Amino acid sequence: QEVTEIKKEASSDFELVFADGSQVEAKTVIYAAGATPRRANIPGEQEYAGKGVSYCAICDGSFYRGKSVAVLGGGDTALDDAVYLADVAEKVYVIHRRKEFRGAAVTVAKLREKENVIFVLEHQVKEIIGEQKVTGVVLEDAAVIDVNGVFVAYGAVPQTDLLKKFAVLDDSGYVRAGETGETALEGLYVAGDARTKKLRQVVTAVSDGANAATAVAEYLK
C-alpha cells in the first residue's frame, strides 16, 4: 500500500499512515521512494521512451557508441552527461534554450575542448521524431538535427515530501545521509536515489539498501 504520512513524536516510534486509513508503528523506517527525472514534456518524448529517449547517460550511453546523440539541458546534469557521452558517441549535440549555462564553468570549458561536441544554444527542442526508434529532434525554428538518441537531462525531483517536516533534507530536497543511510532523525534511514549522493544508478540503490538494512539490524539489537 501507499504510505501517505509518516508521524513521529520526540521519543515515540514512527507511525505510518496508509492510503486506506490504516496505520502501523515501527521503531525504524528505511525510506526508499527515489527520485523522478524531470521530463521535457514535448511530443515524441513518451512515445520513444526506451526507444532512443533516455534520462540516464551512464545507464544507456554505451548503446550509442559511434552514433549521434542530443543532450537537452543547461545545468550540471546535462553538462556531466555530455562529458560522458562525448567519449562514447560520434557526435554530441548540447541543446540549451539560453546563451549561458547554469552548470559549472569548468565543465563547459572541458566540453568546448572536445571536437565531437556541438553546442546548439538559444534553441529549444519542440519535438522528438522517429520511425520505431528516434531519428532526430525538431527545433522551434523547424530545423531538424539527425540523432539516434536523446538524453533529457533536466535533473530529477526527489520524492521526499513525506519527510519535509523532519528537517532532514538538503536544499535540493534530497535526504541528508551517509553511506549507512542513517539520518539526523533517530531511526530514520534512507536508501536509493532519494539520498544525497553523486551517482544514482540501480547498482548504487541496491548497495544503499544493503547498507541501510545492515545498519537497521545493528540499531535494533
Listing of model-derived features with the role each one plays in the protein:
Residues 78:
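N-terminal Rossmann-fold NAD(P) dinucleotide-binding loop
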Residues 27-28, 51, 66-68:
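Nucleotide donor/acceptor-binding cores
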Residues 73-75:
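Glycine-rich Rossmann-fold phosphate-binding loop(s) that bind the pyrophosphate
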Residues 41, 46-63, 154-204, 208-211, ...:
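FAD-site-proximal beta/loop scaffold in flavoenzymes
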Residues 1-18, 23-26, 87-179, 218-221:
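A Rossmann-like FAD-binding core segment of flavoenzymes
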Residues 65-67, 122, 185:
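Phosphate-coordination loops involved in phosphoryl transfer and adenosine-cofactor binding
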